């Protein structure tokens, strides 16, 4: 573990001590009320004919595996890279609201990030995109609760 990573981990542990156990449980309770089911990978780069892409697993500092895709620029590698983070409650493929319940509780639309990756790779960018913990195919952590950055940086 690098010294920068150790410093960040120490800072996170110190911040966690500042939040009372009671407040922490209140936040967990509120999060459980609005927690939506995990989005799933309903499309991959093959859908739009992207070539040379592959799955990879990114190990995090706390051991939770983050599942990802690396998609090279059309025509081969370039020196440009976009790291694409998805929004909540989505995954690296997007949002499957168009599949109906239980995902259409938020909205019944499809949000297609894979098409955006196609535009980026066609424009000469390599794309690295991954599922946040507790989303898509990445590992579960923190009781399935999203910390909105409190834990995810690890």
How should each PLM-predicted stretch be described?
Residues 112-116, 145-154:
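Alpha/beta-hydrolase active-site loop
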Residues 118-119, 134-146:
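Glycine-rich "HGGG/HGxG" loop immediately N-terminal to the catalytic nucleophile
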Residues 32-34, 95-103, 139-144:
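Short acidic, glycine/Ser/Thr-rich loop/turn "cap" segments at secondary-structure junctions
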Residues 36-81:
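N-terminal cap/lid segment of alpha/beta-hydrolase-fold proteins
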Residues 67, 86, 135:
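Histidine-centered divalent metal-coordination motifs
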Residues 130, 135-138, 152-154:
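A charged, solvent-exposed segment within the mature domains of Sec-exported extracytoplasmic proteins
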Residues 1-47:
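N-terminal targeting or regulatory segments adjacent to alpha/beta-hydrolase or S9 domains
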Residues 73-123, 127-129:
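Short, surface-exposed "cap/lid" segments of acyl-processing enzymes
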């Amino acid at each position: 573990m690098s010294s920068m990573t150790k410093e960040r981990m120490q800072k996170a542990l110190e911040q966690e001590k500042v939040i009372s156990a009671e407040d922490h449980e209140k936040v967990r309770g509120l999060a459980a009320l609005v927690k939506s089911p995990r989005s799933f990978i309903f499309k991959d780069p093959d859908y739009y004919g992207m070539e040379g892409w592959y799955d990879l697993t990114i190990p995090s500092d706390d051991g939770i595996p983050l599942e990802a895709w690396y998609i090279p620029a059309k025509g081969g590698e370039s020196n440009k890279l976009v790291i694409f983070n998805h929004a909540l409650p989505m995954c690296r493929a997007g949002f499957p609201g168009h599949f109906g319940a239980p995902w259409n509780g938020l909205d019944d639309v499809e949000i297609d990030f894979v098409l955006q990756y196609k535009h980026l790779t066609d424009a000469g960018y390599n794309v690295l995109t991954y599922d946040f913990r507790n989303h898509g195919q990445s590992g579960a952590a923190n009781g399935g609760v999203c910390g909105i950055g409190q834990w995810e940086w690890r």
